[in-house]
């Protein structure tokens, strides 16, 4: 079933290479099992599915299927190159080398050196880190089968390194899940208490959100602006971070959800904003224009916080469909490959410049050159990502 999902979600019309990689990986991992007792092949299959869901090219999906064969079986880089080409072999080699990084949560020098190595791997081919993120995400999804000590170690490593890198790459789909899974194992009591509290309020909140969505949708429609309007709950780690940083209870956190408006053009974004500000009173100082001033990870949207019908503040985010894709998939949305019908099925890069793909990376590489001190490098990186504050990470 997983193999069918991987093929179904792949954007490639040429699935023969993916099928071949599956059979090679299955045979190479024959007799190996995960801690869960499942056949080992389930893991690379799930990694490949995550990559296919990001709509990456077939070479990346193939490398995802093969990412553990060099480290865990007798298969060599040379054999991979011979069977699947140099491009796939280089991707697998890059992921293998990243898997050999040491980690020590208490040593800044070790963390900084690991991040430097990751950035160098990204500079060679960003797809290496995308495979590694997919690998880490599936490992976090199955972390319950590890010992409690290993759970905390992997969760800490994920929160300290992998979630921030997903944030830097703008891949919110992966970043959010890594954050929530890390919190689940680092602070289980707080996590399950939060899940319970939110579940208790779910029916009332859902009714309120649906009413707001319908009101907004109707007003936007009346203004002649084609739009998709929906409501979404904020993820657990985001809520927990606010509760800790602001010393508040769940009932004191007002933005547990956001209304999202997706339109066709930038012009429609600002037109929709005008409609919204006529409907509800905006809270001064709570408007952010990330369209005019995008975040370093390419995120663009208009954010505004308003007073709702019951007097409760709520947030609305407005973006185009293209901006929404970038918000969900980040750098992966700019690393897509299309299959050309007139070139024998060879993948060709889409018309996205290297400048667009790697603008975020150049800044970090410049920091690396400028930072002679590892502690200074980590301090600057952490402050930029805004995900490493002492308040958030003083877990026991």
Where are these predicted regions, by residue range?
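Active-site helical microenvironments for divalent-metal-assisted chemistry
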Residues: 1-4, 8-259, 263-314, 320-383, ...
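Conserved structured catalytic cores and adjacent interaction surfaces
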Residues: 390
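Edge strands and adjacent loops of beta-rich recognition modules
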Residues: 385-387
